[in-house]
Amino acid sequence: MPNKGLVLIVEDEDSIRLSLRDYLSKKGYDVLVASDGVGALKQLLDYDVDLIVSDYRMDVLGGDYWIKFLRKYCSTKRIIITSGFLRPDFEIPFDVVYKPFDYHDLEAHIVALMETNPGRQP
């Protein structure tokens, strides 16, 4: 199966992070994982990822600061934010998938974003 791209999953909930990693790997993606924004920074420094799937609410470098970081420093990356909680007054400049989500539906969202958006422009 040809490689479909390198995806970084940023999720503090172990069961979601690991099962999503396994699911996307079986679908042909290379997958990196991080449990918080700090771990994601390390991955982003070491690898040129094609797409980021990130939880919004994480204890370490999550929430509004993580979104601000992504907006400023990852504006050319394809990004999907996942969350069961988003503040209505904070604008998310990326695609959002609400928890709980179906992995098949999330993959369809990833495929669509990879095909239609070669990367965000600053």
Annotate each language-model stretch with its function.
Residues D59:
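The feature encodes the CheY-like receiver
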